[in-house]
Amino acid sequence: LTGADLEGLDGLNFHTLCEQDSDALEATLEGVEAKFGDLLRRVKWLNMGGGHHITRAGYDTERLIRLIKGIKERYGIAVYLEPGEAIALGTGVLVSTVLDTLHNAMDLAILDVSITCHMPDCLEMPYRPDIRGAGHPRELAHTYRLGGGTCLAGDIIGDYSFPEPLATGQRLIFEDMAHYTMVKTSMFNGVKHPAFCLWDPESKTLKTIRQFTYGDFRDRMG
């Protein structure tokens, strides 16, 4: 950026972390200060991006505090952290139902949820979502390939094992599904979305926040 016209530039942003502890942030800041320290003295704020696993057990928050205070003191600027998935880590479940089971080279189960519609981040990252009470293939007695109910050939959630055979109508609970997934869903071919609900563990009540209808799909199409 040497010689660049930076008039009107109020702040700088870097986004280099993903599920990292504050030691990775410290290494990044050392590089930022070495290469862009002169710019930090000319701006009003620094956005350190996301990817900070602040809520994870063992995260070094004391180091994070020290790093933030150090930047503020050295340059007199505001410091921002993007919340990222840490604010929802380990929260939220996606409750699905087994629609049918069959056998074609291996045991299969069709669910009323779709990885392309309801769990797109699992495809894009990609990562394998955890199912409560399930294991990796052949870890438990009965292994199934789980698929969604859309016409997409690649709508395959993955292979999981269960202690007992799956049955039509059985509920399967996908864990840790609150981050990214909800904001990236699609209504591919009019597939129905699950409702958003809040569970109160003290009163043991479930409050429905939003239910989706065909009208939501129609209106998104213009």
Where are these regions (language model features)?
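Charged (often Lys/Glu-rich) extended helix/loop segments that serve as interaction or gating elements
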Residues: 67, 78-222
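Active-site loop/helix belt of alpha/beta enzymes
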Residues: 1-104, 189
